């Protein structure tokens, strides 16, 4: 939506159009989220690196890091691919990016069903399906409709995947989810 608005009214106009939505979301979250209890017990300060002693953490963080590297690498080249290979104009580009976003919203809504049924299989299948999607894009890059469908599938998977990784952190480190989350963010940003 932001890309489409940016094409039609400029990037400043796009930001201004989204301000009321952001304010509405802020107010809705303020009203609807429950207050969190404050843990007044002093927890000992420990190094986040101690989490690497938990056997599943190094492997999981490596898989998480590889997933995000692949996702960001592909996303970096989406626009140039669409403009040069698929020959998509500015309006089509905005619509395809909107389709990626809508598909991502849908994926985020439904990924919990798959995570609850087959957690690790879902975490494994998402990057495999994304890699297959990227490979197929190379084969059908000349067809705008095929590219739009494949990128929508990619958006569905790519946006749902972080939900799985945050769930993994909470399950792998139930007593240290905050520290594990910080470590995961550091791995992703590396």
Short names for language-model regions:
Residues 1-34, 77, 81:
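Helix-loop-helix hairpin linking two adjacent transmembrane segments in secondary transporters
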Residues 32-63:
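Juxtamembrane intracellular "pre-TM" segments in multi-pass secondary transporters
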Residues 53-73, 148, 152-156:
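Pair of pore-lining "gating" transmembrane helices in MFS-fold secondary transporters
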Residues 76-91:
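Short amphipathic helix-loop junctions that connect adjacent transmembrane helices
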Residues 98-102, 189-190:
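Short hydrophobic/small-residue motifs within alpha-helical transmembrane segments
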Residues 106-119:
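Helix-to-loop junctions at the C-terminal end of transmembrane segments
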Residues 119-165:
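C-terminal transmembrane helical hairpin of 12-TM major facilitator-type secondary transporters
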Residues 171-190:
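A late C-terminal transmembrane helix in Major Facilitator Superfamily
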